[in-house]
């Protein structure tokens, strides 16, 4: 399972890292904010023209309201903007499956958690 997933990922193309200064003249179809900036209500120093047309933006942070990164993505017309709540639930479901052999339905859990976050927010 993991080896097949890794091979499929490698077939998509090369993966490389860089600093914020190296992003100025590049466009991306997918931008994942895995920095700690959202924990502090801050926005990473992103170039204005970072997103390709229809790009997806994903913030690992989740909460009752959109993060600064998510608001930035919406202002820059990202095709899709998501937070990390789905990843949290899906990782828990995958762990439950590995431990118990049962794959829980995640959509109702995500919906319930989203409602609870909105109540508290």
PLM segments and residue spans:
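Rossmann-fold NAD(P)-binding glycine/threonine-rich loop
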Residues: 47, 55-112
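Short glycine-/small-residue-rich Rossmann-like dinucleotide-binding loops
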Residues: 35-37, 61-62
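Short acidic low-complexity segments
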Residues: 13-28
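Short, well-ordered alpha-helix to beta-strand connector turns
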Residues: 28, 54-55
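NAD(P)-binding Rossmann-fold cofactor-contacting core
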Residues: 1-12
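Glycine/threonine-rich flexible loop motifs
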Residues: 39-47
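A short helix-to-beta-strand connector/capping loop
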Residues: 10-16, 77-79
């Amino acid at each position: 399972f993991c080896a097949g997933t890794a091979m499929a990922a490698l077939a998509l193309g090369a993966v490389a890292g860089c600093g914020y200064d190296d992003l100025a003249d590049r466009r991306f179809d997918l931008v994942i904010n895995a920095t700690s900036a959202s924990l502090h209500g801050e926005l990473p120093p992103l170039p204005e023209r970072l997103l390709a047309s229809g790009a997806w933006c994903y913030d690992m942070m989740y909460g009752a309201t959109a993060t600064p990164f998510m608001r930035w993505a919406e202002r820059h017309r990202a095709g899709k903007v998501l937070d990390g709540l789905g990843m949290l639930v899906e990782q828990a479901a995958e762990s439950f499956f590995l431990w118990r052999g049962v794959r829980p339905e995640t959509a109702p859990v995500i919906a319930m958690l989203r409602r609870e976050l909105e109540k508290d927010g």
